[in-house]
Regions:
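Extended, well-ordered protein cores
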Residues: 1-458
Length: 458
């Protein structure tokens, strides 16, 4: 699988470029092992669902590009790895001048095999207020090519031939990796860098380098609070608060934290005497919970708005965690409640008892409602993991790792249609994907019972 090869190669490259990332991987592995030993029910559930096998795979990376042409070619590059654009994220409402999607696998089997995803942001030059600076940034971006000639040739070849040979796939991974490699030489002089940096640190990060260097890679932890507490012990400067919902018995959506971005030496164009510095790359950790339905997401957004109204969300205020926990007491915290109230998505499978039903019982069970099947122990509901991102969390992570507290207010304008035009495709509605996954499992459950009834009767 090309996606697995690419994910592994990128992890090795990033470990070489940012040694602290290797420490982060070790920390997460230690915490996951301890958590599974302490929680046998969690271990059993992850074994049943197939989640355990994929736990050690790095879950996502993130890049930022500057032009529609770069974004569109990335879509074609990721398609070769079985990754499609899912979701639209307008981060400008949180003061970050980008909008984004996540390239990831969408099928159940593909996600179990390797859930690697890349959160990909496109710079919105229209949000640079200074017209001359905006034109200068556009001209700089127009001069660069972030893909190797061989990578472009292999993309075209794969599209024409319906895939790549094994040897071509290895070559493709090596060529594609060059797009995401860090370059310590800036493509602009120090004066230009400073002007773009003053407009927004992220603008400088996108415009002033040869390509969209991977700015973080993220392993998945089963206990993000333990990871947050342990990071300083391993010499990592952790961000102040964990982004996302509070700690719960039944984790929902996504929680994220990171070690703060490293200050790295860069050499500016035309500067032979000294070196400058740039801050962008960091290490992130995530804990994933159950995916929420539209009803569940509406409740989540409503509660988060209440927390924001009580104070500055994402700030290091001492009582932020307390406010979050207090407000989220209104969000049900058992899987039975979440399922019965249609707040979260589940994958339904036959239990051993259900698989052993006699013909008449199986036929009757096939027509029963899900609650009845679960109550009788004939079916089980496993939470569907949330595979996507939270706009507010993503913006909070970006802000904390760009080295400042500025929250530049851009007009709250979600330009999804323009983004899709630049991308060259529509993005998937992520909630629709979870709806389909849940319905597939229900259909398969009923089909299995009907097949069992026919088989036993025969």
């Amino acid at each position: 699988e090309i996606r697995a090869r690419f994910s592994s190669a990128m992890s090795e490259m990033y470990r070489d470029e940012v040694p602290q990332y290797g420490t982060l991987i070790e920390l997460v592995a230690d915490i996951n092992q301890r958590t599974l030993q302490a929680e046998p029910e969690l271990l059993a559930r992850m074994q049943r669902s197939g989640e355990l096998a994929r736990l050690g795979v790095e879950r996502h990376g993130a890049i930022r590009v500057g032009t529609a042409a770069e974004l569109s070619m990335l879509r074609r590059l990721f398609a070769i790895m079985g990754m499609e654009p899912v979701g639209y994220y307008d981060l400008s409402v949180a003061g970050v001048p980008v909008h984004s999607t996540a390239f990831r696998p969408v099928g159940d089997a593909a996600l179990l095999a390797n859930p690697f995803r890349v959160f990909t942001s496109l710079l919105r030059l229209d949000l640079i207020a200074d017209e001359a600076l905006r034109a200068q940034a556009a001209a700089i971006l127009a001069r660069r090519n972030i893909f190797t000639e061989r990578a472009l040739a292999l993309i075209a070849q794969s599209e024409a031939n319906g895939g790549l040979t094994d040897a071509e796939a290895d070559e493709f991974v090596g060529e594609a990796l060059e797009t995401f490699r860090w370059h310590s030489e800036s493509t602009v002089d120090g004066t230009t860098y400073d002007a773009l940096h003053k407009a927004h640190r992220l603008i400088a990060d996108v415009v002033c380098f040869k390509g969209p260097h991977i700015n973080h890679l993220t392993p998945r932890t089963l206990d993000i609070d333990a990871a947050q507490a342990a990071m300083p012990e391993r010499g990592m400067d952790a961000k102040d608060v964990v982004e996302g919902p509070p700690r719960r018995d039944c984790p929902i959506l996504l929680r994220q934290t990171s070690f703060k971005a490293l200050k790295e030496t860069v050499r500016f164009a035309g500067d032979a005497t000294g070196a400058g510095s740039h801050t962008a790359r960091f290490g992130e950790i995530e804990q994933r919970g159950v995916a929420l339905t539209r009803k569940g997401r509406a409740l989540y957004d409503q509660l988060l708005a209440q927390v924001r109204d009580m104070g500055s969300a994402g700030s290091a205020a001492l009582d932020y965690g307390s406010r979050l926990a207090q407000v989220f007491e209104a969000f049900p915290d058992t899987h039975e409640q979440l399922r019965r109230q249609d707040l979260a998505f589940y994958r339904f499978t036959l239990s051993d008892e259900g698989a052993a039903l006699a013909a008449g019982e199986a036929a009757a069970a096939a027509a029963s409602d899900l609650d009845a099947l679960i109550a009788r122990g004939l079916a089980q509901a496993e939470p569907i993991v949330y595979e996507d991102f939270l706009p507010v969390s993503a913006a909070g992570i970006f802000q904390s790792n760009l080295g400042g507290e500025e929250q530049k207010q851009y007009a709250a304008h979600a330009a999804q249609q323009a983004f899709e035009a630049d991308l060259g495709a529509r993005v998937h509605d992520e909630i629709a994907l979870y709806e389909q996954a849940q319905q597939r499992s229900i259909d398969q459950l009923r089909s299995a019972l009907r097949g069992q009834a026919t088989k036993v009767a025969a």
